Amino acid sequence: MVSDRSGQRRPGKSRVPGALRSRVYLHIGEPKTGTTFLQQVMWSNHAQLAAQGIVLPGYSHRDHSRASRDLREAPRVAGDPAASWAGEWDVLTGQALRAPWAAVISDEVLAACNPPQADRGIRSLLPAEIHVVLTVRDTASLLRAEWQETVKCRATVPWEEWLAGVMGTASAADRRRRSWFWTVHDTLATLRMWSRHIPPDHVHVITVPRQGPAEALWARFAAVLGIESSRIDVPSARVNCSLGLAEAEFLRRMNEALPDGMPDWFYTRNIKQILAHQVLSTRSAQPRLALPTAQQEWASEQSEILFAGLRDAKYHLVGDLHDLLPPPASGRYVSPASVPTQQLLDAAVHAAAALADHQFRASHPVRAEPQRPRGLRQRASKLEWAVLNGLWTRRLLHNTSHLAPVRRLRVVIWCLLTHPARHRPNPAVAGDLVDGGGENRTPSPGRGRIRART
């Protein structure tokens, strides 16, 4: 059963005839806390969510990821074939504000925003009723998951050395924001930053269940949205699975051998998404990474600090705070550096065979009968994908996506194609678009003016 400290049901449908404000749920992370699983559940059930009053702006999670990069001012790598993400945050928030019901924006790396970026994120969603959602887990399992994620992102730092670096910056506030781990996992600081302009009961902290099926995490997330989790189909496929001890060490050593000239975007698409996620993580019954004995006490202390901080705060807690306390360690610690050579060789052979199969399938694709898109939403998704990825449009998009008229046009197209019956043109919306929208716009009839809390 989901534990809700407020004891209140939070309805999903927020915009009804006569309502003053829309509602937007901003799911900001943290990474490695089941966020990918929750996003997969929502995007594979967007029609069922809409039936319960929850809308996902954009056409896929990629739109949320690109918007997050725009908000965080993430630099583009030279040669990256992906389209520019300049202006994507304004497009996504514009769609969320014009959604017919409550909207959800979800990207785990939003936790990496600095204070000015978080302030901009909140201001851009006014005058909506804004809710910030954060999922959290115990420190010990988080450390294991994050090191593996760094390895899947081309890192070469051994486990014990990486762990020492995280521990060395834990108490230095000026260095904390320079460490990626603490940038996205300094939970109490992240909550303070995002909650400065919204009521504390609009900040929802969800603990990741320590045991049990993945559906339990979805049930907690659905409780925050105010919808019935049982009416949503939860995918059976495992998402973002962890690597075995030998697989993680093999990938780390392979990263050391890769040429410096290989671009990061190529690594992400082929090594991380194919080799790590689809191949190495599927090798079952492999020994798993554990914390060294000397570091287990430190991880427990960090979990207790988080436990006490959330217990004393006024945020809306969903789940059990005891999920944040790691269970006692069991078994003998095995360092990744001491994995037997035969286990590394087995992982390497498995990886080489899978990459060869992937290359063959990529060069000899099976041609299937073209399927006609069904529904306006699917057609819109295919159309925008073609536009964003067409070679002849990339330069044009790079030069114009930041322009306000282009952003507003994309918002209008999304509204008309995804919810045509609820977005018929009217003078209020048309005037809003001409005036440029934003936080200083004149409210439409029936909509109150909302000011940011200072």
Residue map of PLM features:
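Anion-recognition interface
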Residues: 2-454
